[in-house]
């Protein structure tokens, strides 16, 4: 091939294409695949891109007819009470699971799983947790692999307690969104072609309004919205939508986003710099990449031969790593065990957890206990959607939304597991730098149990950035105790401890 001859893939495809085969649909089997697919689609890989990447514009005309009457909500709430999940250890708090309609005419309903605080539920705040993808389940990741009260054993049948669950500090609501994710569904097939950031924020808003009719004691309660990965879009977009519609029963206090997709350009640049700084690629490879590849292009571009060669080398250097935690073991045997593995503990990450969760949530008795899959969906439950056909809009940045929220007094915390290679700490630092914030406290370690829990810096305008030492993309999966400590300090609006005595 002649020097300078064009290649059909954009530069980002060179690292991501091996993670998820390029086809016209958005579905993928895991969070890493789903996010990779989105980036490929945004840059026109595998065909021309029609995705809208302009700044987020919330739906302003959410019609009252979309908001379900509260008349029968008490009965629905009683029906949603989970008596006990199969294989569950005893607990002292209530759990609920069920559906909330977000669009009556389309037959669009979202599945939720709600766990009350383990103590002081009547005074504890409400946390809504969203996972990203786009197209991945908060039940699969947030609830059963990260911050929920249970984890799934290797037998795919039984559960064990997460002593560092976030319902130690809050009432926690997990949402599968948008329709087509997990147990959430639509009776209108064309809905699956209309997904994007804008419609997802609108539906999430309507869900929350209707859910509060079912659980009215949480109206006016301190509300926090949190999430990871592509929820770096979902969370500030929903917060913006809430503020836009001025409903008095929302008492939005803050947002919390982890290893979050914030700004495409800095997310990509930070990923490559992280690879080099962590000895995954050579200095020469990084220099050649920056010299020969256009890392700033927001649409499909032609790649030179030199760019293709160095990109292929980076592929080879990073292909056999778990990019979501570069130091984590890989799942080499996903076969379920007859009995739970001996010595299973919340502090030890199991790379095969995805498989245990998928087996558990596809058990008919589990779905019955959760009040899930009532319509008998024509496909198995999956951690990331296989039915969402298209993602129509995804802004290149959510920085304007974050700054807007700060300007309205909303507390913003951004955290980063420091072993994630997909949206690494370098990406987040570059994105924050682009915001031109003024530091309030200098960069310093924070502590838990006499050890460094991570590093943190506070900025004027109610924004805190914190790393979590030894954590990957799904921070609570790898460092449950440190993540809970961070969450509690976020809720209390107190600085992370700057002394090893803590």
Swiss-Prot record:
GO terms for biological process: proteolysis. Its EC number is 3.4.16.-. InterPro entries: AB_hydrolase_fold, Peptidase_S10, Ser_caboxypep_his_AS, Ser_caboxypep_ser_AS. It is an enzyme of class 3 (hydrolase). Expressed in roots, leaves, flowers and siliques. Residues 1-24 form the signal peptide. The keyword Signal applies. Probable carboxypeptidase. This is Serine carboxypeptidase-like 40. It comes from Arabidopsis thaliana.
């Amino acid at each position: 091939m002649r020097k300078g001859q064009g290649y059909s893939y954009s530069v980002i495809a060179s690292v991501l294409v091996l993670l998820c085969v390029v086809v016209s649909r958005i579905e993928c089997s895991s969070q890493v695949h789903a996010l990779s697919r989105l980036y490929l689609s945004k840059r026109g890989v595998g065909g021309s891109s029609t995705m809208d990447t302009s700044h987020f514009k919330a739906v302003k005309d959410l019609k009252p007819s979309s908001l379900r009457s509260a008349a029968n909500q008490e009965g629905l709430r009683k029906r949603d009470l989970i008596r006990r999940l199969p294989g569950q250890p005893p607990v002292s708090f209530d759990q609920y699971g069920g559906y909330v309609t977000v669009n009556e005419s389309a037959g669009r309903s979202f599945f939720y799983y709600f766990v009350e605080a383990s103590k002081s539920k009547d005074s504890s705040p409400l946390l809504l947790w969203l996972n990203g993808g786009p197209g991945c389940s908060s039940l699969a990741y947030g609830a059963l692999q990260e911050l929920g009260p249970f984890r799934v054993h290797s037998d795919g049948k039984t559960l064990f307690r997460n002593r560092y669950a976030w319902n130690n500090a809050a009432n926690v609501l997990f949402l599968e969104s948008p329709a087509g994710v997990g147990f959430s569904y639509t009776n209108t097939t064309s809905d699956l072609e209309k997904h994007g950031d804008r419609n997802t924020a609108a539906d999430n808003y309507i869900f929350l309004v209707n859910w509060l009719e079912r659980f009215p004691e949480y109206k006016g309660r301190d509300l926090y919205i949190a999430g990871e990965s592509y929820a770096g879009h979902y969370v500030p977009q929903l917060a913006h939508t809430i503020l836009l519609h001025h409903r008095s029963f929302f008492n939005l206090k803050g947002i919390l986003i982890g290893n979050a997709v914030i700004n495409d350009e800095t997310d990509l640049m930070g990923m490559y710099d992280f690879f080099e700084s962590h000895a995954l690629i050579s200095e020469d490879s990084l220099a050649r990449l920056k010299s020969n590849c256009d890392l700033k292009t927001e649409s499909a571009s032609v790649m030179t031969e030199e760019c293709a060669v160095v990109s292929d080398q980076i592929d080879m250097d990073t292909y056999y790593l778990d990019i979501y935690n570069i130091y984590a073991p890989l799942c080499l045997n996903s076969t379920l065990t007859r009995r739970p593995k001996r010595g299973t503990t919340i502090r030890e990450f199991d790379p095969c957890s995805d498989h245990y969760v998928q087996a558990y949530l596809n058990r008919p008795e589990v779905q019955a206990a959760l009040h899930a899959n009532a319509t008998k969906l024509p496909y198995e439950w999956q951690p990331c959607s296989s039915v969402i056909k298209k993602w129509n809009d995804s802004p290149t940045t959510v920085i304007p939304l974050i700054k807007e929220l700060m300007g309205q007094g909303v507390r913003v915390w951004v955290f980063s597991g420091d072993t994630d290679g997909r949206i690494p700490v370098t990406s987040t630092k570059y994105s924050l730098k682009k915001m031109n914030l003024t530091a309030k406290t200098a960069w310093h370690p924070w502590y838990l149990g006499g050890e460094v829990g991570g590093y943190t810096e506070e900025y004027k305008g109610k924004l805190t950035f914190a790393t979590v030492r030894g954590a990957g993309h799904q921070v609570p999966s790898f460092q449950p105790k440190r993540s809970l400590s961070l969450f509690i300090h976020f809720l209390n609006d107190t600085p992370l401890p700057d002394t090893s005595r803590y």
